[in-house]
C-alpha cells in the first residue's frame, strides 16, 4: 500500500510504499486484546500484601478454655474473625506476568500498525529533525499539523532535540522503533512514523 509522506512543516515529501503484510492486515480485536493484556499484566507491580494469621502480632495462647464457658470454641486472637486478626487467603507479593509466544507478539504489533493504517490514523513523516530543542517551535508545528494525541516512532535513535521539545507537550509520546508496542500504539489516536522508523519496523517484523 502507498502512503503520503509529509515534513514537519506540513509540506509534502512524496510517497512511500508500505508492506501490506505489516500495514495492510485486517485488524483482529482478539489478537490485540491478548497482547495488550500480556503487556499490562507484565507491567503490574504485584506488590500487594496483607498480614496473614501467622504474620499478625498477637499471642498464640488459647483465649479461654475449650468447654464450659458457653461461648464458641476459639484458639488464638490471630484468627480472621477477630478485630486485628490475620486476613484469610489475602493477596501476597507475586508476579502477574504470563507467557505469550514471541511470534504472536509480533503478529499483535502488525495488527496494531494495520489498525492505524486502515482507519486513516497513520502518518508517515520524512524525519523529525529539529535544529534546536524548543518546545514553542514544536507546539506551533503540532498545532498546524492538527495532532492531538499522537505517538511518534522514529528509527533506531530518536532525534534528541525533538525528544526534548516534546517532553513538555501534553499528548505526545516519542519512542524508538525498538520500543514500538501494541499498548502505546492503541493508546494514542494518531500514529506518526518517520521513514527511518518504517524501514526499521519492516526489518524487525519481516
Swiss-Prot record:
Q: Which is an annotated Pfam family here?
A: Ribosomal_L4
**InterPro entries for this protein:** Ribosomal_uL4, Ribosomal_uL4-like, Ribosomal_uL4_dom_sf
Keyword Hydrolase attached: no
What's one GO-annotated cellular component?
ribosome
Keyword DNA damage included in the entry's annotation: no
GO MF entries: rRNA binding; structural constituent of ribosome
Describe its function.
Answer: One of the primary rRNA binding proteins, this protein initially binds near the 5'-end of the 23S rRNA. It is important during the early stages of 50S assembly. It makes multiple contacts with different domains of the 23S rRNA in the assembled 50S subunit and ribosome. Forms part of the polypeptide exit tunnel.
The record, for PANTHER family, names:
50S RIBOSOMAL PROTEIN L4, LARGE RIBOSOMAL SUBUNIT PROTEIN UL4M
| Gene, per the UniProt record | rplD
Name of this chain's protein? Large ribosomal subunit protein uL4
Q: Which domain of life is it from?
A: Bacteria
The record's NCBIfam families line, in alphabetical order, gives: rplD_bact
On assembly, the entry states: Part of the 50S ribosomal subunit.
Keyword set, alphabetical order: Ribonucleoprotein, Ribosomal protein, RNA-binding, rRNA-binding
Q: Which GO terms describe its biological process?
A: translation
Q: Which family does it belong to?
A: Belongs to the universal ribosomal protein uL4 family.
Amino acid at each position: 500500500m502507498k502512503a503520503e509522506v509529509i515534513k514537519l512543516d506540513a509540506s509534502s515529501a512524496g510517497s512511500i510504499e508500505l508492506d501490506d503484510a505489516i500495514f495492510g492486515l485486517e485488524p483482529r480485536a482478539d489478537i490485540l486484546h491478548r497482547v495488550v493484556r500480556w503487556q499490562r499484566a507484565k507491567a503490574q507491580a504485584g506488590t500487594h500484601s496483607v498480614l496473614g494469621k501467622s504474620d499478625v502480632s498477637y499471642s498464640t495462647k488459647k483465649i479461654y478454655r475449650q468447654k464450659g464457658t458457653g461461648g464458641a470454641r476459639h484458639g488464638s486472637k490471630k484468627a480472621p474473625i477477630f478485630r486485628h486478626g490475620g486476613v484469610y487467603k489475602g493477596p501476597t507479593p507475586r508476579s502477574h506476568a504470563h507467557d505469550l509466544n514471541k511470534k504472536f507478539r509480533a503478529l499483535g504489533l502488525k495488527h496494531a500498525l494495520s489498525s492505524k493504517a486502515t482507519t486513516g490514523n497513520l502518518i508517515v513523516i520524512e524525519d523529525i529533525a529539529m535544529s534546536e530543542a524548543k518546545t514553542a517551535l514544536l507546539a506551533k508545528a503540532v498545532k498546524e499539523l492538527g495532532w492531538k494525541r499522537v505517538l511518534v516512532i522514529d528509527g533506531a535513535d530518536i532525534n534528541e532535540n525533538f525528544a526534548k521539545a516534546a517532553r513538555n507537550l501534553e499528548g505526545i509520546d516519542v519512542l524508538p522503533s525498538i520500543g514500538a508496542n501494541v499498548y502505546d500504539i492503541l493508546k494514542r489516536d494518531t500514529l506518526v512514523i518517520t521513514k527511518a522508523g518504517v524501514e526499521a519496523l519492516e526489518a524487525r517484523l519481516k
